[in-house]
Design a protein with these regions (language model features):
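Short alpha-helical donor nucleotide-sugar binding micro-motif in glycosyltransferases
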Residues: 79-85
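A charged, aromatic-enriched C-terminal amphipathic alpha-helix characteristic of glycosyltransferases
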Residues: 155-161, 174-192
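Aromatic "clamp/platform" in nucleotide-sugar-dependent glycosyltransferases that forms part
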Residues: 93
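Conserved donor-binding/catalytic core segment of Leloir-type glycosyltransferases
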Residues: 2-19, 25-28, 40-41
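Short alpha-helical segment that forms part of, or immediately flanks, the ligand-binding pocket
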Residues: 79, 101-109, 117-121
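Nucleotide-activated donor-binding/catalytic signature segment of Leloir-type glycosyltransferases, i.e.
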Residues: 51-76
Length: 192
């Protein structure tokens, strides 16, 4: 069990607009205005990015309260990192599954995520802080997606909801186990 009082939020996955990495830092900075004893750990990389693109993401997240963690080599290393954090934050516009989020649940960690896309197959108001999504927009990031479909529109209202869910975690759930998340994760295996 963790013994320090600092709240550590966590995100992992490929650096992408689709995963909400363009807005997560702003929501985190809003949290910092109300509680300076917080950190955001980012275990993100994207092997398909150019060095310039990778630097752009690293620079966006260059902040004394943000820790950029290199990609873990094994599942045990991923778990060891997840065991040190308090809450996963996944403000995704679209997902194929969002395995990292489910792994956080399996570790008993609380999660905050968008109420949109594939992870709604296992995220509920009982096991996740769900950010309301009221609209979609053409999926466009200028690299991978060029408007072929739609994804969640994350505007000022959704960013505020993300920040509020992060603060709600600190005020109401810090130090508790996401038992509903553990029960959800038990329903999934590599066999099904």
């Amino acid at each position: 069990p963790r013994t320090h009082s600092k709240t550590i939020f966590f995100n992992c996955g490929k650096w992408e607009v689709r995963k909400g990495h363009d807005i997560l830092i702003d929501a985190f900075k809003s949290v910092l205005k109300h509680d300076t004893d917080v950190e955001l750990w980012m275990m993100c990389s994207n092997p398909f990015n150019s060095p310039e693109e990778e630097n752009k993401w690293q620079n966006l997240y260059s902040h004394p309260n943000v820790k950029i963690i290199p990609r873990a080599e094994t599942q045990q290393e991923v778990y060891n990192i997840m065991a040190q954090v308090d809450c996963g934050v996944f403000p995704s516009r679209a997902e194929g599954w969002n395995l990292e989020l489910l792994e956080m649940m399996a570790a008993g960690k609380h999660v905050v995520t968008t109420d949109y896309s594939a992870h709604t197959e296992f995220c509920t108001k009982e096991n996740a802080g769900l950010v309301s999504i009221s609209d979609t927009e053409p999926a466009f990031d200028g690299k991978w997606f060029f408007g072929q479909g739609n994804w969640a529109k994350i505007g000022a209202h959704e960013e505020m909801d993300l920040y509020m869910k992060m603060m709600k975690y600190i005020l109401n759930k810090k130090g508790t186990v996401n038992q509903a998340g553990i029960e959800t994760a038990k329903k999934f295996s590599w066999q099904n």
